[in-house]
UniProtKB/Swiss-Prot annotation:
Extent of the signal sequence: 1-23
Gene Ontology cellular component terms for the protein in this record: extracellular region; extracellular space; neuron projection; secretory granule lumen
GO terms classed as biological process: mast cell degranulation; negative regulation of voltage-gated potassium channel activity; negative regulation of voltage-gated sodium channel activity; neuropeptide signaling pathway; positive regulation of behavioral fear response; positive regulation of peptide hormone secretion; positive regulation of phospholipase C-activating G protein-coupled receptor signaling pathway; positive regulation of respiratory gaseous exchange
Residues forming coiled coils: none
Magnesium among keywords: no
Modified residues (Methionine amide): 50
Keyword hit for Signal: yes
Taxonomic classification: Eukaryota, Metazoa, Chordata, Craniata, Vertebrata
Subcellular location: Secreted; Cytoplasmic vesicle, Secretory vesicle lumen; Cell projection, Neuron projection
Function according to Swiss-Prot or TrEMBL: Stimulates the release of gastrin and other gastrointestinal hormones. Contributes to the perception of prurient stimuli and to the transmission of itch signals in the spinal cord that promote scratching behavior. Contributes primarily to nonhistaminergic itch sensation. In one study, shown to act in the amygdala as part of an inhibitory network which inhibits memory specifically related to learned fear.
Similarity comment: family membership: Belongs to the bombesin/neuromedin-B/ranatensin family.
Protein name: Gastrin-releasing peptide
Length: 148
C-alpha cells in the first residue's frame, strides 16, 4: 500500500465498525405515534416559522412606524388614483364635445378640374384588352406598342 491510500482505508474501517443507531433519540416514555413520525415537531408549524427571527426592539415601536408608513403610502396611492380619474374624465369630456360647425360654401375640391394636363390617355396606345407590366410602354421594351 502506498502512503496516500492508508488514511482512506482507516476511515472506511472506522465507519464500518461505528455503531448504527437512531438519528434522533426518542424520549424514554416512548411517546405517541406522531412523535415517532415527526420527532422534531409538526412540519406545518416549522415551515411557517422558518423566516421569523426575533429582534431586540419592541414590536409595538416598529408597528407604529410601519403603520405611519403604510398610511403615507395609502394617501399617495389615493391621490394618484384621484389624479388619474380626473385626467380620464377630462379626456372623455373633450372627446364628447360636438364638432365645431364649418363654413360649407367656401370649400375647394381636393383636385383641380382645370389642371388635367398631368393625366395621360394610356388606352389610346396599343391594342385594347392587352395588359402589360407597368413601365413596359417605354421605347425598347415593347416595340409594337410604340408604333402608331
Amino acid at each position: 500500500m502506498r502512503g496516500r491510500e492508508l488514511p482512506l482505508v482507516l476511515l472506511a474501517l472506522v465507519l464500518c465498525l461505528a455503531p448504527r443507531g437512531r438519528a434522533v433519540p426518542l424520549p424514554a416514555g416512548g411517546g405517541t405515534v406522531l412523535t415517532k413520525m415527526y420527532p422534531r415537531g409538526n412540519h406545518w408549524a416549522v415551515g411557517h416559522l422558518m423566516g421569523k427571527k426575533s429582534t431586540g426592539e419592541s414590536s409595538s415601536v416598529s408597528e407604529r412606524g410601519s403603520l405611519k408608513q403604510q398610511l403615507r403610502e395609502y394617501i399617495r396611492w389615493e391621490e394618484a388614483a384621484r389624479n388619474l380619474l380626473g385626467l380620464i374624465e377630462a379626456k372623455e369630456n373633450r372627446n364628447h364635445q360636438p364638432p365645431q360647425p364649418k363654413a360649407l360654401g367656401n370649400q375647394q375640391p381636393s383636385w383641380d378640374s382645370e389642371d388635367s394636363s398631368n393625366f395621360k390617355d394610356v388606352g389610346s396606345k396599343g391594342k385594347v384588352g392587352r395588359l402589360s407590366a407597368p413601365g413596359s410602354q417605354r421605347e425598347g421594351r415593347n416595340p409594337q406598342l410604340n408604333q402608331q
